[in-house]
Amino acid sequence: LLFYNDYNAADPQKRDRIYNMVKSMKEEGVPIDGIGMQGHYNIYGPSMEDVDAALTKYSTIVKHIHITELDIRANEEMGGHLNFSREAGDISQTVKLLQEDQYTRLFKILRKHKDVVDNVTFWNLSDRDSWVGVRNYPLPYDENYKPKRVYSLIKDFDPAADNAVVKEDFRPSVLNQPGQQYPMVNSQGYARFRVVAPDAKSVIVSLGLGGRGGTVLRKDKEGV
């Protein structure tokens, strides 16, 4: 199979350029079978909405999409500002949760497009051998080649959760104080919170998990 492989392939502007170029080449008879999307991501970017949109658009012109060079580093640095740390160091539980959430959201989208996404290649096996170094914590295995929690989140996913339908019959919790609207719960046991954090990129809600996990709430492009 012949692939066109590129970086930043989820960026909306570059996505359109790649789409137009590959479409034009195929119309001229170039036998391109698929598109490769290099996956050097971080805990905040790209947005999974952009990844989803790119997969949707590319799938209209090719039958195969590969995610190549996948890693999700624990920072936002890019290009010449990227910190290539080779020394092991501590990483906060918050950053771990953000990375786990980004990996989980990514693979949920990849499963959504499973008819066209037929390969995912990680850019090395463990943090020890990563091109960005162990302190960037980018891969499913740690510096001692032990699987991290994110490995299980990728491998042992719940298929039912991918297409869960949440009922909108939310009511204030019976444990709320008089006049308190949030948190709200529905008949399925889902909870809804109202969080005011105008300067935050994300908020982690952890209930009774003892710091071992949590739900990451991320702002959309409108800041909500």
Describe the function of each predicted region:
Residues 15, 77-78, 132, 205-208:
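Short, solvent-exposed loop/turn and secondary-structure capping segments
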